[in-house]
């Protein structure tokens, strides 16, 4: 399953409701972006990060 490297955000599940309040299952997927970052040792690592975390954090991208 796709998961954010920073926040741990994954797919959420719930119901879609019609006007008659019938319930059918649906999913909300996180806006994950694949980026390359440097870790503590200076090695380049490819990870998936949510767009919200990408805006908030100051990561050293490659």
Curated annotation (Swiss-Prot):
Tell me the disulfide pairings in this chain: none
UniProt key word Ribonucleoprotein: yes
Q: Which GO terms describe its molecular function?
A: structural constituent of ribosome
The entry's keywords:
Ribonucleoprotein, Ribosomal protein
Write down a Pfam family by its short name: Ribosomal_L28
Coiled coil feature spans: none
Q: Does the keyword Nucleotidyltransferase apply?
A: no
Q: Which Gene3D superfamilies match?
A: Ribosomal protein L28/L24
- What domain of life is recorded for the organism? Bacteria
Task: Please report which protein family the annotation says this sequence is part of.
Answer: Belongs to the bacterial ribosomal protein bL28 family.
Q: What is this protein called?
A: Large ribosomal subunit protein bL28
Lineage summary: Bacteria, Bacillati, Mycoplasmatota, Mollicutes, Acholeplasmatales
């Amino acid at each position: 399953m796709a998961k954010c490297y920073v926040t741990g955000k994954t797919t959420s599940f719930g119901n879609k409701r019609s006007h008659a309040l019938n319930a059918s299952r649906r999913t909300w997927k996180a806006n994950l972006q694949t980026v390359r970052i440097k870790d503590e040792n200076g090695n380049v690592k490819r990870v998936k990060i949510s767009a919200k975390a990408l805006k908030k954090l100051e990561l050293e991208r490659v």
